[in-house]
Amino acid sequence: MTASNPANPDKNPISYRSSGVDIDAGNRLVERIKPFARRTMRPEALGGIGGFGALFEVPGKYRQPVLVSGTDGVGTKLKLAFQYARHATIGIDLVAMSVNDILVQGAEPLFFLDYFACGKLDVEIATQVVQGIAHGCEDAGCALIGGETAEMPGMYPEGEYDLAGFAVGVVEKDRIIDGSGIRENDIVLGIASSGPHSNGFSLIRKILDLNTVQSDTRLGETSLIDALLTPTRIYVKSLLTLMAELPVKGLAHITGGGLLENIPRVLPDGVMAHIDSSTWVRPSLFDWLQQHGNVAREEMLRVFNCGIGMVVVIAPEHAQTAIEILHNAGETVWQIGEIRPRQSETLPIVIA
């Protein structure tokens, strides 16, 4: 018995592809990205990409391993990537946002999974994005062991996509960094960012809309767009080196909320951070944004990293050695403040 088909009087067969989902394109993407994923593999990764689940053995060197997880996206920085067709590095941003977060608790990133969603899959663009994700995983020393590509017709405008990532790391139970040991007179170090990283882009895009900006608009020796789309710096290798050499009391990844809101997240009761903004060089990009957007100083400090992508709190006797270790690992670092006693009615941070 043949079912009637009043909605399709010509009786042309319909398919998943004609409905907007191309399974073959998804399979081609998987084959394209396998070589990139293989370059990220660690010996603890069991199996490869393409299975229903990804397997990873906890490294045997840990006595009391504690798993640390983090998930994040790239936010509206993606909109600039679409507008200027810069897809090759946005995946680095995706990895950085999660691995830097779990690093704050002392964790070594182990593996990463990604989620790529679009209305219509463009294999070339998706390949560029995942290649960037793999690059970020290599920088972080973690394995890209799986992910999901979701082609969902009608969900996203043509040429646009969304990204999310998920990282898992491990730390010895007795070496978890939670800020509880921070005391008066400890030193606050700031490690340079590579730009806005992946935060504040809704404000950035508003500022761009209010000004005449072209793809070749200059900002010193680079273009404004290049400066804005510089990928988020990954601090994993340099900070793991530091943590192996010295006891780090606290770390803060300067993301949404800027310096004003992220540093207090790692401070125990009874202390506050006093930061001297004259101690580091604020990149000219932030000057441009503040000037062209008429953005108040406090708003800048609570939205952008203002040139500091990661904060380290360390005992005074270890501060100079920490600066040298980070410098030798390729970081630009400044002593930007100190920990002071806090009265109950005072703010947990002052940026002078």
Curated annotation (Swiss-Prot):
Pathway(s) annotated for this protein in UniProt: Purine metabolism; IMP biosynthesis via de novo pathway; 5-amino-1-(5-phospho-D-ribosyl)imidazole from N(2)-formyl-N(1)-(5-phospho-D-ribosyl)glycinamide: step 2/2
Domain of life, source organism: Bacteria
Keyword presence, Ligase: yes
UniProt keyword Electron transport, yes or no: no
EC number: 6.3.3.1
GO cellular component: cytosol
Name by which UniProt lists this protein: Phosphoribosylformylglycinamidine cyclo-ligase
GO terms assigned for molecular function: ATP binding; phosphoribosylamine-glycine ligase activity; phosphoribosylformylglycinamidine cyclo-ligase activity
Family per similarity comment: Belongs to the AIR synthase family.
Record field: catalytic activity: 2-formamido-N(1)-(5-O-phospho-beta-D-ribosyl)acetamidine + ATP = 5-amino-1-(5-phospho-beta-D-ribosyl)imidazole + ADP + phosphate + H(+)
HAMAP family from the UniProt entry: AIRS (MF_00741)
Main location: cytoplasm
